[in-house]
Amino acid sequence: MDPRGILKAFPKRQKIHADASSKVLAKIPRREEGEEAEEWLSSLRAHVVRTGIGRARAELFEKQIVQHGGQLCPAQGPGVTHIVVDEGMDYERALRLLRLPQLPPGAQLVKSAWLSLCLQERRLVDVAGFSIFIPSRYLDHPQPSKAEQDASIPPGTHEALLQTALSPPPPPTRPVSPPQKAKEAPNTQAQPISDDEASDGEETQVSAADLEALISGHYPTSLEGDCEPSPAPAVLDKWVCAQPSSQKATNHNLHITEKLEVLAKAYSVQGDKWRALGYAKAINALKSFHKPVTSYQEACSIPGIGKRMAEKIIEILESGHLRKLDHISESVPVLELFSNIWGAGTKTAQMWYQQGFRSLEDIRSQASLTTQQAIGLKHYSDFLERMPREEATEIEQTVQKAAQAFNSGLLCVACGSYRRGKATCGDVDVLITHPDGRSHRGIFSRLLDSLRQEGFLTDDLVSQEENGQQQKYLGVCRLPGPGRRHRRLDIIVVPYSEFACALLYFTGSAHFNRSMRALAKTKGMSLSEHALSTAVVRNTHGCKVGPGRVLPTPTEKDVFRLLGLPYREPAERDW
């Protein structure tokens, strides 16, 4: 979506004036006027165990239970019907956390995915496939074997369960999306460069974002304590990374998705990540659907679209409009304007709005800015304007010429959308290495000094970011000549042993990269911009507890081969 999409969507909308004294950012209404909560959970008496689920997500579950007629009660309380625990929880650990010798009579121990599915379907669903296995020593009679249990689960139940994992997970202490372009940094030393984003190369857990990487929503999981690599998914062609992006489906529902994208962007700039994710899931599902949606029932049948979303789809079909668009807070276009400043994330944009700022001129004259934000504001228009491919080529050649003046054997490759063959680029990422594995050392500082002396580098955003053996520079460049714009440039120097994985990482789209990492994880492997490792040990929450063994990957083709994937040319990684 165009970075200024919301501003374009509402150029003449009359503003709704909020109480000027309010310091709380207005939120999009949770439900339409006159809409009443349904009590379809009235028979539920639940206790939510927060361990593993996380406080924020547990509180969301509890709020939804009460809102829809259910009751919250202690685990040992009379009449408790369901005890909800984290996906990776086993029976004995649950009892220890609850400080109970055994489950209360009539209580069922269920995974949080069951409650997510109930909330998604707006009904109490069967717990088959969601119950925590109870060891036979805790039973008065033998429990059916796992094979018997699996045989009793209707086909498709596991897939439905895995789809529900897109419900809000506990907010992580750091983002679980792949490392993004720098957004905020208090100084030019290496550190998290956004108040909303940070990275160490590989996500610590496969999250809702990873699940978006699967077209079908299919996501194999492993049992606790299973350190053996999981088998590859039965149908690899359901993974984004297994398909060429040239085969993207035609969007038969553009008239619907373009309106939902405005809402998704509005939620995103307001910091409502989970609701934005829900809309993104529905938008992706609609874009992949093989025909135009024509009815409520048809919308409900699409995986990833619930009843409430289906109602919005039908409203658009019947009226050509979505009433929620009329209720978008007046803060949203301003927040989008502010968050487009390089160095300012969602939190900073909200802070500025709460301080009374409403324009870039307000920010320029009144806000306290970091060095990076001041640079981002100075080049605001240039950074938002995508550069033609020819300009990106000139930038790559300028860096290459300067590097090879020190050593003619250095390899310099522009990655990102440029390497994927796009006609325009937002910025340029240049990878530098040397085949001998040694001569790249010491080139980083000398190259930057040379480019500064030429006047090619005009501003430093992050002068040096150490990432293992990789060194990364984030800055601003401008080609010589009248009318040239300032452009974002990243220069990354990597050892040759990591070059293939770095090339793969900095070339693929965010969606493609998430899919590759998620697939690697299902195989007991780990993929980052540094290496592909096997025999990686993870705990029940998906966090690595053993680094595994690094596999040799001389070329990108080796990475695809080791993951059991057909090789995809850079132009086919543009999901």
Curated annotation (Swiss-Prot):
Mn(2+) binds at D427, D429, D490. GO terms for cellular component: nucleoplasm; nucleus; site of double-strand break. Changing Y505A: No effect on polymerase activity. Reduces terminal transferase activities. It catalyses: DNA(n) + a 2'-deoxyribonucleoside 5'-triphosphate = DNA(n+1) + diphosphate. Expressed in a number of tissues. Abundant in testis. It is found in: Nucleus; Chromosome. GO terms for molecular function: 5'-deoxyribose-5-phosphate lyase activity; DNA binding; DNA-directed DNA polymerase activity; metal ion binding. Signal peptide: none annotated. Its cofactor is Mn(2+). Residues 420-429 are annotated as: Involved in primer binding. Residues 36-132 form the BRCT domain. GO terms for biological process: base-excision repair, gap-filling; DNA biosynthetic process; DNA replication; double-strand break repair via homologous recombination; double-strand break repair via nonhomologous end joining; nucleotide-excision repair; somatic hypermutation of immunoglobulin genes. CDD domains: BRCT_polymerase_lambda, NT_POLXc. Residues 194-203 have a biased composition (Acidic residues). PROSITE patterns: BRCT, DNA_POLYMERASE_X. DCTP binds at R386, S417, Y418, R419, R420, G426, D427, V428, D429, N513. Its EC number is 2.7.7.7, 4.2.99.-. SMART domains: POLXc. Its main location: nucleus. Residues 265-279, 345-348, 466-505 are annotated as: DNA-binding. Keywords: Chromosome, DNA damage, DNA repair, DNA replication, DNA synthesis, DNA-binding, DNA-directed DNA polymerase, Lyase, Manganese, Metal-binding, Nucleotidyltransferase, Nucleus, Transferase. It holds the Pfam family DNA_pol_B_thumb. Interacts with PCNA. Interacts with PAXX; promoting POLL recruitment to double-strand breaks (DSBs) and stimulation of the end-filling activity of POLL. Interacts with XRCC4; promoting POLL recruitment to double-strand breaks (DSBs) and stimulation of the end-filling activity of POLL. Interacts with NHEJ1/XLF; promoting POLL recruitment to double-strand breaks (DSBs) and stimulation of the end-filling activity of POLL. Belongs to the DNA polymerase type-X family. DNA polymerase that functions in several pathways of DNA repair. Involved in base excision repair (BER) responsible for repair of lesions that give rise to abasic (AP) sites in DNA. Also contributes to DNA double-strand break repair by non-homologous end joining and homologous recombination. Has both template-dependent and template-independent (terminal transferase) DNA polymerase activities. Also has a 5'-deoxyribose-5-phosphate lyase (dRP lyase) activity. This is DNA polymerase lambda. It comes from Homo sapiens. The gene is POLL.
